Structure formats: C-alpha cells, structure tokens
C-alpha cells in the first residue's frame, strides 16, 4: 500500500505590515498639573450632582445623562488637546466634556434648564449642546451619529491644513452601530486626523457589554480597517493623559486614525429615569471603593505632600462655582416664544 505523502510543515505567518503605536506610559504630572486635574474632575462631579438635584426638582426637563464616575476620561484626554485648533464631539452624556474643555458652567447649567442664556439658547437641553467658538460640536441624541460627524470634522482639519485633530467620543453601545464602521473605513482610507474614543462604562443602557458584543475587547474593533487600538484604564486620569499623548503623536504625524478604549464605569443609571436594577448596589460600591478616579488623584497628591485639609478650600471653591451656576440658571429668563421660528432653516453658509 502506497504511503501517504509527508505533510508539509505550515509556513510561518507573515510578519505584520501594520505599524503599531507605542504602549502609552502613565503621564508624569507635576503637582500643579495634578491639582488642576483634581479641580476639573471635582467640578464635573459636583456639577453633575447638582444637575441631578435640579432634575429631581423639575428645573430640568427631558433626558439627562450624568457623567459621574467617568470624569478621568474627559479630563485626562482633553487636557492634552490644543483648544485653539482641536475639535471635540460626543454623544448625549456631554456635560463633563464641555466642562473639561473650559466652557463656563453657568451657560451649561442654563442650557440644562432651558434658559435663553444657555449655550444653545435654551433649545438644546442636556443632549444637544454646541459651541463652534470652543470647537465643541455636540452633544448628539442619536446613538453613534457623532462618530461619522467626527470623521467629517477630521476631514475638515485635513482639508484646511490647520493642524487640528478631531476627538470623537462614543460608548460601548454605540460601538455596535453600523455608521461607526463606515466612519472607521473612510477615516483610514483618507488617513484622517481623528481619535476614536470608546467610553466603555460597561453598560449600554441596561445591557452589559459582554451580552451585547461578540468581541468585547472594543479596542480591537478597528483591526479589519488597519486602525490600531489601545485599551486604557479610564478610571486613572494619568493613564488617560498618557494614552492621549501617544494617540496625538500617532495622529498628528499623519498615520491616520487610532482607537482608544477607555475602561470606565458610571455610578448613576443610564439617565435620570433609569433605576439601574440590572446591577447590584454592591457592584457600584465596590467600584467606588477600589477605583474612584477622584480619590485616586487625592492619593497621588498625598504622596506629594498635600493633605486632606489642603484640599478643603478647593472643595469649597468648586461648590461655590456650582451653586452660582445653579442660581444663574434658575434666575435667567426662558427663551422668547419668537425663538421657535429661528434656527429652522440654514440662513448662512
């Protein structure tokens, strides 16, 4: 009986032809930088707590999505941006990103309460805030819509040769939307200067990420488009800043888009109307005790010689800013009824 031919050894896999970014290093912040991170994160936390109170009192209508627990992401990433040329766009959980980009808390709170002094003149509410002056392009209520718009912002940066980068935030739920992948494809084809930021807070409304995503390592989502991804501890502001530095170096050097998956956690429900019965109080408390981003910065500051008593004046200052923003929002007038007929048609191009 003839012998079967010997099986040939499988050839070694071809070397990857895809360049990869360096592994980001945790940012080495000075005492002054750490204090600024602490102030910004505390401002977001206290602002959102006040917004939740105003919602409960009926001053805020419609939907309201709070950023409590995720503060390190917006502060760490946006502290690395150039506010003169870089643009930011996000979804409906947008208050924290606006505060991290230096927008006045008073006009944000006024928008939340539907006042004419709000950043969108009281028409946008919680989910639809916008400021071309500050290069903040929303605030979008349609899940995933901001990702393709972010690719458009990046195209504008490249077309105008202004050196700017677009940072487009979206969540783990939006990561399953079809238009996200269309945006990935075009961004890589045209080597657009965009950082896709997936804020993986573990739950898309009430559905955990591993129940909704066959690939729950979301930083890998761009591999078939040749877009590199990095997974980041989104509860550590210094890790976030370090990842931003690496991503910006990649994008500004003309290598095209990059994905940052920020592993974070929201303490409140999806929105103010969500009782969050899909997870236990013990789960939330465990994350607070082990991974709270603000407490982590306080520990860093302690190693630099700052004690709890040194931080109390900052807490008092932040509470004063937030209370003044709430008072302003409650006292300023609502939009004139004639505003119903403005911003309906495009009047200038």
Question: Regions from the language model: what does each represent?
Answer:
Residues 49, 57-190, 208-214, 219, ...:
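Cofactor-binding active-site loop characterized by glycine-rich and histidine/acidic residues
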Residues 158-162, 214-246, 290-315:
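Conserved thiamine diphosphate
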Residues 202-207, 227-232, 277-286, 311:
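Short beta-alpha connecting loops at secondary-structure transitions
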């Amino acid at each position: 009986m003839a012998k079967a031919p010997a099986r040939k050894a499988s050839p070694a896999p071809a070397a990857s032809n895809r360049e990869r970014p360096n592994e980001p290093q945790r940012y080495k912040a000075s005492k002054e930088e750490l204090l600024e991170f602490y102030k910004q994160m505390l401002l977001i936390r206290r602002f959102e707590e006040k917004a939740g109170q105003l919602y409960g009192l009926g001053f805020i209508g419609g939907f309201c999505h709070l950023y409590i627990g995720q503060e390190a992401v917006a502060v760490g990433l946006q502290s690395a941006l150039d506010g003169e040329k870089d643009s930011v766009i996000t979804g409906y959980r947008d208050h924290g990103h606006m505060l991290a980009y230096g927008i006045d808390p008073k006009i944000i709170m006024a928008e939340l309460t539907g006042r004419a002094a709000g950043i969108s003149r009281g028409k946008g509410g919680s989910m639809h805030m916008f400021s071309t002056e500050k290069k903040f392009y929303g605030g979008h209520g349609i899940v995933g819509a901001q990702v393709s718009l972010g690719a458009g912002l990046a195209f504008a940066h490249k077309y105008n040769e202004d050196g700017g980068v677009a940072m487009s935030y979206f969540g783990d739920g939006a990561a399953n939307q079809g238009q996200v992948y269309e945006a990935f494809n075009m961004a890589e084809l045209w080597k657009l200067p965009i950082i896709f930021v997936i804020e993986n807070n573990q739950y898309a409304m009430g559905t955990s990420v591993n129940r909704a995503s066959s690939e729950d390592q979301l930083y890998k989502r761009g591999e078939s488009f040749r877009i590199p991804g990095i997974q980041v501890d989104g509860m550590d502001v210094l890790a976030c800043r370090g990842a931003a530095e690496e991503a910006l170096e990649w994008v500004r050097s003309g290598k095209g888009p990059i994905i940052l998956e920020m592993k974070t956690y929201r303490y409140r429900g999806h929105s103010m109307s969500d009782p969050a019965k899909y997870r236990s109080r013990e789960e939330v408390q465990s994350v607070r005790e082990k991974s709270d981003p603000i407490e982590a910065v306080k520990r860093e500051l302690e190693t630099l010689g700052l004690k709890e008593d040194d931080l109390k004046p900052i807490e008092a200052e932040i509470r004063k800013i937030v209370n003044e923003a709430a008072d302003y929002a409650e006292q300023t007038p609502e939009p004139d009824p004639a505003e119903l007929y403005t911003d309906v048609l495009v009047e200038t191009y």
